[in-house]
Regions:
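Acidic Gly/Asp/Thr-rich repetitive segments characteristic of extracellular carbohydrate-active
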Residues: 47-94
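Right-handed parallel beta-helix
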Residues: 102-225
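Extracellular calcium-associated, cysteine-rich motifs in secreted modular proteins
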Residues: 434-501
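Extracellular beta-rich repeat passengers
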Residues: 242, 247, 253-434
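Bacterial N-terminal signal peptides
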Residues: 7-16
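Detector for repetitive beta-architecture
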Residues: 67, 91-93, 99-101, 107, ...
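N-terminal pre-domain segments of enzymes
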Residues: 25-63, 401
Length: 501
């Protein structure tokens, strides 16, 4: 009887361990219970990573492909550099064995898609790009935990810190920090299945070197199903954001954009505007006028709508249609007057009051929808005030948030500014990176041993029952039915940087 009970118990234990997605474990009587081997899933229905949301949610990037390790901060294209890894073709995941500033010698362009850039894998303080724009011209791209702080040292007279506007699809940019552009910091339009989420977009350079003169713009946003959520835009003179509309496609029926849970601080001039053609949701965004905003008539505007001038591909007069709900204007900045606060409270009571029709080309009623547009999944929608706290806690390259982003978050929370420009800008608007002390130092740290260069540290592989001498197990589905073993490791580093349900 004892032998029978032991056999039943042993069988039950073996079946339990074999069905678990966890690591290989010692079995009763010695030996090892083999790892579970899940079949490769259909990635078209699996989020890019836990926390991915919006139109680009199901981007697969380089999942299951080669692992390329960046070991050098040089930008000469040699093996081991970021440019070398980006130029490669085929599915690939780019991980980092170094931290610091990469001083780009020319624009960094992704021409070959099916790629994941996992900035969170960098040891120490992480990666920061300098001098030139980071441009995406490919399909199926995931970029996470990268900083692009361009500056004006390279004398680029009208460049963005990061952009993608070449009619591509399946792109998600997550937890990145963008600043010090000479044009816009973050410009993304005319792409489909696109998400920009959990990013800090701050301090574009105003009186710098743009060929048209003063700039300092946040970004141009849009897309044929695009989502922009949980981003912080801070300290820009304008374009927070400009909505591109269907100016270049001539297809307003295809322009569909979701903007939710964004935080916009210390904006100026027109603030958010344009949208010449398309359908737009503005849901639960948090507007916080700062000292610069208090000097502008835009302090009480959620959006200023434009009609198309007919100079590109739209018919003249085309305009967007907008749905507003749950957006909140924070009246706590000490620079605001009582009258300004009263105006803002009217917008909080009725968001449609915050829509301005430029030139009065049509009655406001023609621009308003009474129900939200069905655009993309929106599983992380929060009330505006909760989103404010979440964005300040988690946005940007926050695996190790640098001193620059810490300052921006602090200013946003307190409704203050710390610096003025060296060429005439003021109230938190800057002209050169040196106005705020320049680039922070990004220290590296000891790189965990990774004998097979598969992106997973040896110690982590052993802990999870993988083989630190077998590079092929990075692409296996042993620890999860949805994500490769490498993805489980990379996601595990940063899963805490999203609101916990």
């Amino acid at each position: 009887m004892k032998n029978v009970l032991f056999s039943i118990s042993f069988l039950a234990l073996t079946m339990s361990l074999a069905s678990s997605p966890m690591s290989a474990l010692p079995a009763v009587g010695g030996g090892v219970v083999p790892l579970k081997e899940y079949p490769a899933p259909d990635r078209s229905h699996i989020p890019a990573f836990p926390g991915a949301d919006g139109a680009g949610k199901y981007t697969s990037g380089g999942a299951g492909g080669k692992v390329l390790v960046v070991r050098s901060l040089k930008d000469d294209g040699s093996e081991g550099t970021l440019r070398w890894a980006i130029r490669k073709k085929g599915p690939r995941t780019i991980v980092f064995a170094v931290s610091g500033i990469i001083e780009l010698t020319e624009p960094l362009k992704i021409h070959n898609g099916d790629v994941t850039i996992a900035g969170q894998t960098a040891p120490g303080d992480g990666i920061c790009l300098k001098n030139y724009t980071f441009n995406i011209q490919a399909d199926n791209v995931i970029v996470r935990f990268i900083r692009s702080r361009m500056g004006a040292d390279a004398k680029r007279k009208g460049d963005d810190a990061m952009n993608a506007f070449q009619n591509h699809r399946n792109i998600i940019i997550d937890h990145c920090s963008m600043s010090w552009s000479t044009d816009e910091c973050a410009t993304f339009y005319d792409n489909s299945n696109f998400t920009l989420q959990w990013c800090i977009i701050s301090e574009s350079l105003a009186n710098s070197i743009h060929e048209k003169g003063a700039h300092g713009y946040g970004g141009i946003w849009g897309g044929q199903t695009a989502s922009f959520h949980h981003n912080l835009l801070a300290n820009h003179t304008n374009r927070t954001p400009r909505l591109c509309g269907s100016r270049y496609t001539g297809k307003p029926e295809e322009e569909k954009v979701d903007l939710f849970n964004n935080v916009i601080y210390n904006y100026g001039s027109a603030g958010a505007y344009a949208g010449e053609g398309g359908s737009y949701n503005f849901l639960n965004n948090y507007y916080k006028p700062g000292p610069f905003t208090a000097t502008k008539s835009s302090y009480k505007r959620l959006f200023t709508a434009y009609a198309d001038d007919g100079k590109n591909n739209n018919v003249k007069g085309v305009h967007g249609v907008f749905y507003f709900n749950g957006n909140y204007m924070d009246p706590t900045c000490s620079s605001l007057t009582d009258k300004q606060r009263q105006d803002m409270m009217k917008v909080n009571k009725d968001n449609t009051v915050g829509l301005v029709v430029s030139g009065k080309f049509a009655p406001k009623s023609e621009l308003l929808s009474d129900k939200p547009f069905e655009i993309a999944e929106r599983s992380t929608l929060q009330p505006a005030w909760d989103a404010f706290e979440s964005v300040l806690a988690y946005a940007g390259a926050s695996y190790r948030r640098d001193s620059y982003d810490c300052r921006i978050v602090d200013e946003t929370r307190k409704g203050i500014y710390s610096y003025t420009g060296s060429h005439g800008s003021s109230l938190g608007i800057i002209d050169q990176p040196s106005d705020v002390g320049g680039w922070p130092e990004y220290k590296t740290a000891e790189v965990p041993a990774d004998s097979d260069a598969d992106g997973m540290p040896d110690a982590w592989e052993k802990e999870h029952g993988l083989d630190p001498e077998d590079a092929s197990d990075s692409a296996g589905y042993n620890l999860s039915a949805e994500y490769t073993n490498l993805e489980v490791y990379m996601n595990g580093l940063v899963n805490h940087l999203y609101p916990q349900k």
